[in-house]
């Protein structure tokens, strides 16, 4: 034995052990007897399983795709050499492991007996070559390694399933040789997990660990299997404890969430099916979060090192068939997860795949998405939209304001307010930023991951900087720059019909404090209130990005105009900025929603040498030109900043000050923030104050 089962935790306890994430029981559980097949199904399930492969169009398409992966007419390639190009080596190991898995599945569920036998022979041939070539001569720690540990997790799971399918047909001699090959790689991963990723427990630790866990369950009678599984659980728990919030937010961003999902979803099925350990309930908040945070297209945000991603919740829907969920008053979680995927617009990702060959998982060379879709699909599941309140306030720090779960029509609104504790990997300087989607179009945007790769110089020169996000800097410093497990505190939250909002706070180190409130008013427009409290002199900069639109100016109003594209229909965003003693300038910055689809677009930078009075930004989405909507800004130096908005027969006043008396449009108060919305008769529809001792509206005392 190279290691005991005791924890090997090299991470600082004050950072990696203290976040709100989750873990599954660390004690490894293996079956009393190794049995095959068992990872995805049992032998007794084969007849029923084959019927599901043609149950509907979705299943038939995935079955066809799986059969294409198992091409008996395609000769096997020779193993690459140690000096071959990185891409050649990487693609070889991915393709060989996928082919082994596909042929093995076809050997059980393919056509007639002769065809199945041919697939079985091919699968055996592939398994007897598993991990041939230079893999053990190459170092996974090398930057850009062809055998990076993040790939090895998928290769392990592919070979595990292949062996699981054909093991009962193997001769003792072939079985011994194949087990030796698979065990060698499992032992290599076991010994090197913490060498490859010695510090932060990010996805480079968890992905190979989930693969190691699957192989341990496959070779459960191996003398080292218990140790492999223990190490896998230990390492993956480090990741889920630190990078996930208790309510499911993944702090490396949507891209790495889906990238990791390609390994943890198979492991969850394998552990449940082989050992009877059901960890799906522990992971439930992750899949609920995907539904809670998705926009009207069904896309997860491109926050942190991320591109837009769909919600592949269909992969686990069947596992939650009878699970109660906060997302619906009566329907099980399985129906909500089925709905979320069925109502995801996959067209941008299919367009990307058609051009580049890459699917949305980030693991296209290593992970056969269609095969897992085939094995997890249940055509009998209903699709039911959530009937929970559409506005979501996650304790992990993300807030979503939306008009409905399903609407993508005119009047559609979605704003994500991001205030999550900063993790130490794939982070961007985006604290308290926001993303706006409205009228079905992406408007106020996050600039995204990079043009196409982690290694691209533009990623650190632009994409992960504060200027690429809808956020602020003070004296050149972004908010909450350093890793922390402290979620930005919420100062207040208001939830009224017609007025919803929240204020979160952050710091610019010891230099200044920042409070940002975002209000959604009349189900229509948004107002952002920024209050900075300097502790020393410094320049404040605010950045406002309008997505893939052209920018024009009409007096105090800025207008982003969007053409119909793969991200949404034609639309406009009308914006006003009220920032006393500050200068607003137009700049250009690059934006990427989908890998490779990048271009420069205009954004606004507001700069103030001194910050004395709150800054306000008003955002009014529209399908086209404004109709009966006017905005007037009011500024009183060192006292308050305000917007007076007339929309149809309604008038709304939003003002923010320094606790000095405000008297405006019949409103009198000493509040730091006040919002009053009235109809044509003067009736108050909404009113809100923050830190006020009095409020009078049209001479009537509201407070005290």
Language-model features and meaning:
Residues 47-50, 58, 400, 408-410, ...:
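Short, solvent-exposed loop/turn elements at domain surfaces
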Residues 360, 450-704:
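CBM-like, beta-strand-rich accessory domains located in the C-terminal region of large
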Residues 256-443, 494-495, 607-614, 629-704:
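Carbohydrate-active enzyme catalytic cores, enriched for enzymes
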Residues 38-40, 46, 50-53, 59-299, ...:
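Aromatic-lined, polymer-binding surfaces characteristic
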Residues 2-63:
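Mature N-terminal, pre-catalytic/accessory segment of carbohydrate-active enzymes
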Residues 201, 388, 488:
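Flexible, surface-exposed loop/gating regions in the mature catalytic domains
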Residues 444-449:
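Catalytic Cys-His active-site segments of thiol-dependent hydrolases/isopeptidases
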